[in-house]
UniProtKB/Swiss-Prot annotation:
GO terms for molecular function: RNA binding. Changing E133G: In strain: Isolate MA20c. This is Protein PA-X. The record marks L28, L65, K202, K203, K206 as: Important for efficient shutoff activity. Keywords: Decay of host mRNAs by virus, Eukaryotic host gene expression shutoff by virus, Host cytoplasm, Host gene expression shutoff by virus, Host mRNA suppression by virus, Host nucleus, Host-virus interaction.
Length: 252
């Protein structure tokens, strides 16, 4: 699974996922399914934000990378992917600037057009079940919830899907592609089922000649892309980085 993740996701996303797991003391060599899930969630959050701007009239518009109007205000502020301290700093800044109610839990995005925080969910289960779990945890009408599945289903608060149909279709297509690529490599069943995941982990460790009881060292290097990304996020001038082409999964 780890090899699949490194092949199929943008290196910037992989770096952010590694950083997030290390922050919580999790070993991506062992919890490979979580590694894949975090990368998938990060990519969906980036795709949700991609190309969406607000013009001078306060209207939401979709702008391609090479469009001369690319300096317009970004519609979404990306919170997911930052370390917790920085993320809360951004949330507090947004609340102080917009008057939005501070959420109890860290959200994934802030929508400057609708003036609301957004919680993005990506599930391998039924969308309505995951939606209810999110809603019961957040318990706030001020945080908008939008759930996507790997089968093309989605569910959002009050059936308000925020994005246009084409933008949502891009996300659904990407998720379906990830599912197909996992299935082609025999990884999908273990990704969905914890029981199958344990079997896959034992198989991977055996093939690598590792012992599950031994700690595995994780690289602590920080790539140039990650060093550039964080200050760009703080300045809300991240177009070039976030618009980088996502890597396609090479065929086995």
């Amino acid at each position: 699974m780890e090899d699949f993740v490194r092949q199929c996701f943008n290196p910037m996303i992989v770096e952010l996922a590694e950083k997030a797991m290390k922050e919580y003391g999790e070993d991506l060599k062992i919890e490979t399914n979580k590694f894949a899930a975090i990368c998938t969630h990060l990519e969906v959050c980036f795709m949700y934000s991609d190309f969406h701007f607000i013009n001078e009239q306060g209207e939401s518009i979709v702008v391609e990378l090479d469009d001369p109007n690319a300096l317009l205000k970004h519609r979404f502020e990306i919170i997911e992917g930052r370390d917790r301290t920085m993320a809360w700093t951004v949330v507090n800044s947004i609340c102080n600037t917009t008057g939005a109610e501070k959420p109890k839990f860290l959200p994934d995005l802030y929508d400057y057009k609708e003036n609301r925080f957004i919680e993005i969910g990506v599930t391998r289960r039924e969308v309505h079940i995951y939606y209810l779990e999110k809603a019961n945890k957040i318990k706030s009408e001020n945080t908008h919830i939008h759930i996507f599945s790997f089968t093309g289903e989605e569910m959002a608060t009050k059936a308000d899907y925020t994005l246009d149909e084409e933008s949502r279709a891009r996300i659904k297509t990407r998720l379906f592609t990830i599912r197909q690529e996992m299935a082609n490599r025999g990884l999908w069943d273990s990704f969905v089922s914890p029981k199958e995941a344990k079997k896959q982990l034992k198989k991977d460790l055996k093939s690598q000649g590792q012992c599950a009881g031994l700690p595995t060292k994780v690289s602590r290097r920080t790539s140039p892309a990650l060093r550039i990304l964080e200050p760009m996020w703080m300045d809300s001038n991240r177009t070039a980085t976030l618009r980088a082409s996502f890597l396609k999964c090479p065929k086995k």
